[in-house]
């Protein structure tokens, strides 16, 4: 990924010089479902998949959320991550993740998407709900809306980082 002032390396390292990492069935799916920062990097522009999966559609309700597509793509499947940059991304102008309408759509559509998996993966969905709320709380903190920030942070995982956000939101 390349920004205006610095280059950020977002490529995983292969431990055995093969140049790729292999992930077991559902390993990437569960990592994405729980919004974990550990696991396969799945940047939208660099996901390569077999043509037999082209029937998996992007959501059309909001027209901008890829979370459900990623979940469907990796559910019950093995995957491979190429450990080299497939493209450089230039970031200019406005940042979509700071757009309130995008964040609101992402929040509600993420909850809708994970509800599909609630019966089969209850603890993972519960963890995902907390992380989605934490993300929304940190967004409102960054935007300066401390009341809304606290509302969502209180629904997230209570850990030191969350407590510090809550304390400094008053």
Predicted regions and their residues:
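Conserved nucleotide-sugar donor-binding catalytic segment
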Residues: 10-102
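Positions in alpha-helical segments
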Residues: 56, 134-135
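A short, conserved acidic/glycine-rich loop-to-beta-strand motif
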Residues: 1-2, 6-7
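Membrane-interface aromatic/basic loop that binds lipid-linked glycans or pyrophosphate carriers
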Residues: 140-170
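Charged/polar low-complexity intrinsically disordered segments, enriched in acidic residues
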Residues: 122, 137-138, 142
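Catalytic core of nucleotide-sugar-dependent glycosyltransferases
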Residues: 85-93, 98-124, 146-156
């Amino acid at each position: 990924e390349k920004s205006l002032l610095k280059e950020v390396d977002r490529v995983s390292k292969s431990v055995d010089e093969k140049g790729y990492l292999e992930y077991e069935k559902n390993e990437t799916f569960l990592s994405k479902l729980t919004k974990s920062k550990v696991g396969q990097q799945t940047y939208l522009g660099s996901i390569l998949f077999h043509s037999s999966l082209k029937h998996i559609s992007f959501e059309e309700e909001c027209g901008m959320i890829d979370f459900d597509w990623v979940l469907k793509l990796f559910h019950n499947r093995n995957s491979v991550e190429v450990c080299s940059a497939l493209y450089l991304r230039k970031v200019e102008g406005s940042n979509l993740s700071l757009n309130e309408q995008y964040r609101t759509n992402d929040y509600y559509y993420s909850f809708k998407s994970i509800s599909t998996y609630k019966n089969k993966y209850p603890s993972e969905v519960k963890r995902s709900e907390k992380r989605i709320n934490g993300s929304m709380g940190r967004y409102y903190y960054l935007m300066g809306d401390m009341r809304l920030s606290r509302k969502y942070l209180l629904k997230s995982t209570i850990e030191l980082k969350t407590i510090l956000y809550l304390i400094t939101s008053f």
